[in-house]
């Protein structure tokens, strides 16, 4: 990988961190807050006081019952970040995003209907005899102007769209363009009795359609979840195909009429489609990213809540909002943007020149593919091939266009943008060349049927690939600060090339004076242009499948060319989401037990997989270790569930609810590289749960770097830090797999004699721990999450409260715990050294965070633990347990 790209990526992350912190503070103002009564039960972390199980129980109960959803700008009422991200995100519903995205695609239907309409109207006998100036037929020049001037209007409409959409919103722009601009143009066309008024009406309608074509894909991209973005934007092209088909069907039913209704009925029906879209938009939300653009975070949160189907205080929704806000603020810090900035690369817009070229080139090659030649002039062309019913053939081509757009909705997310465009372009090239060869060689009815068959193949390939994917890429490729302008430029490029093709095609194909009379030879031109488009796609298009709109910037920084972009796309997705894992995976390296892993890659996986647990019977006999049955995966018990259902199997009388609050991150002289989310595991360990990070001492340890990026600031990327962290994990694995030991102790609560064993799932004892819920923390660690169990050095470590602290803190394990903490202290010191020396107070904060007992243990346990550590300090650590 290019080291410069790695350096730029790292610099970008560092610079964005400050904006992430500021965005987090802003989002606090719209998050859940605790009532004053709840504050009375929280721990004063500054005094170091320890909460008892009773106070902890009361605090969690109050938190569950007293937090309410409010909007407020007074961020002082929210004490810490734990309110924002302490609870697992709820399962998001994709239904509303799908409905919104599909509905606004009606804008594409207007485009397709008007495009197909002119193809049929100019061939109607009544129109040729009453509207055409010579009352016989339209000349090549008249056809050229009549067809192309719609595209001229759309060109200007697309360029004006960003000014309206950035000033007043995406939603008002769509409403204004349909109910006013488009309807005015449509009225002129309905009332036209001659070619002049018909042309003027098409230009005005074109302005409305152009604005819609620039804003609808933009709205879809900004409102839709990333897992559906490609498919939803592709519905815009699908709606275009339906418009073409319906216009052909309507014209087929009216073309035989011998009065003005033959063309006025098809044109007048456009009032229905435009009114349907305009009225429906009143009930849809504004784009959340537009609200961020206008710094209206409360409205942005409400919009996201509507689109994602979760409450406004959901942690997953708030994290998404923080990311959107921080990315936009980072871009805005470089100043306002204009149309010129869309073509200039900068720190806030990496490879912007290439991105702009990619969007414009794709739109141009889409129009140069030859598709609009068939839809604009198909009826006339089929007439000249000897086909008896050209209207029927034209209708068939429209039907093929509709049908094959459906698989394209799935191809774009399943195969990715690059593969779909390359494969589709190759098929289109071959089909065009075959049509040209057959059309030039033979003049028979059989040859005409072969031509029609391969034209249908070309349309099928176009519809499933280039038709929708080009709009997807044009809508998602650009930073938020210039996104509306760039999308408008791409749409304008589409219409400009469309205008050129519509203007010159009659002169190229038709026979007569001042024409080239190419006929079927024009398909050689389309085939050659398709081949050029494939080359451009291969070299310039970056694979953006599965990335958020904000992650696309990182892709362009990391990847030097589009050819290698799929690798970096995979790296980014794996870092953020993790690829698909089996629900249960057995690690054979001797460092872990059977553990559950979340399927983070599949967005359709229910969100209750956020913390998976093992469910089913596991046979741990010496000769056979396998999972017998996994009926289902369930959530870790909630605070309320555990409070109501104490651990009866262990005789637990004082329940301890799980603490899912964030541990404050020590402030360093450098900003954290990425957001972190800490959970108190007890015994001096804090787990960074963000992106499945390992137990973390550094605030940026959740950052996953690829193997090519060794040298980054995280514990997973830095070679020396990674080695040290591996030592810690190896040590814990050694503890997990050490020989079972037992000590007979007396339960201080019940007075019963109990045997405490050193065992794991791989050395199961007779005392089955039915209530242990193991989670895979990665890197050889398994967490027993039931009742806040620490990393499962002991299978029954969650019973420490009920057993008077004798489980994990007895003298038999003191040396082991001391050795583990010694290694963590070494790692903390290496982290301090790496920072280049910090203030003494900062060093103390880091070391205390890594070594101190977390706040959720009781005073009794605290005393025993300190006593154990003192004993361990006076005894040398067993060399056999210290992994080299």
UniProtKB/Swiss-Prot annotation:
Post-translational modification: Phosphorylated in the C-terminal tail on Yck consensus sites in a yeast casein kinases YCK1 and YCK2 (Yck)-dependent manner. This phosphorylation is required for interaction with HXT corepressors MTH1 and STD1 and ultimately HXT expression.
Annotated spans, Disordered: 30-67, 642-671, 686-725, 739-772, 791-812, 857-884
Keywords: Cell membrane, Glycoprotein, Membrane, Sugar transport, Transmembrane, Transmembrane helix, Transport
A GO cellular component entry from the record: cell periphery
Compositional bias of kind Basic and acidic residues: 857-869
Major localization listed first in the record, in broad terms: membrane
One Pfam family here: Sugar_tr
GO BP terms: carbohydrate transport; D-glucose transmembrane transport; fructose transmembrane transport; glucose mediated signaling pathway; mannose transmembrane transport; negative regulation of meiotic nuclear division
Keyword Hydrolase set for record: no
GO molecular function: carbohydrate:proton symporter activity; D-glucose binding
Membrane topology: Multi-pass membrane protein
Residues on Extracellular side: 119-143, 200-202, 251-264, 380-391, 441-451, 510-521
Residues listed as glycosylation sites in the UniProt record: 383
Positions with biased composition (Acidic residues): 701-710
UniProt feature, compositional bias: Polar residues: 45-67, 642-670, 713-725, 739-765, 870-884
Inducers of expression: Glucose-repressible.
Top-level lineage group: Eukaryota
Annotated compartments: Cell membrane
Topology, Cytoplasmic side: 1-97, 165-178, 224-229, 286-358, 413-419, 473-488, 543-884
Effect of residue 229 to K: In SNF3-1; constitutively signaling glucose receptor
Membrane-spanning residues: 98-118, 144-164, 179-199, 203-223, 230-250, 265-285, 359-379, 392-412, 420-440, 452-472, 489-509, 522-542
Entry domain remark: The C-terminal cytoplasmic domain seems to be important for SNF3 regulatory function.
PANTHER family registered for this protein in UniProt: HIGH GLUCOSE SENSOR RGT2-RELATED, PLASTIDIC GLUCOSE TRANSPORTER 4
Cited function: High-affinity low glucose sensor that is part of the sensor/receptor-repressor (SSR) glucose-signaling pathway, which detects extracellular glucose and induces expression of glucose transporters that bring glucose into the cell. The transporter-like sensor generates an intracellular signal in the presence of low levels of glucose to promote low glucose-induced expression of HXT2.
Similarity-based family: Belongs to the major facilitator superfamily. Sugar transporter (TC 2.A.1.1) family.
Protein name: Low glucose sensor SNF3
Gene name of this polypeptide: SNF3
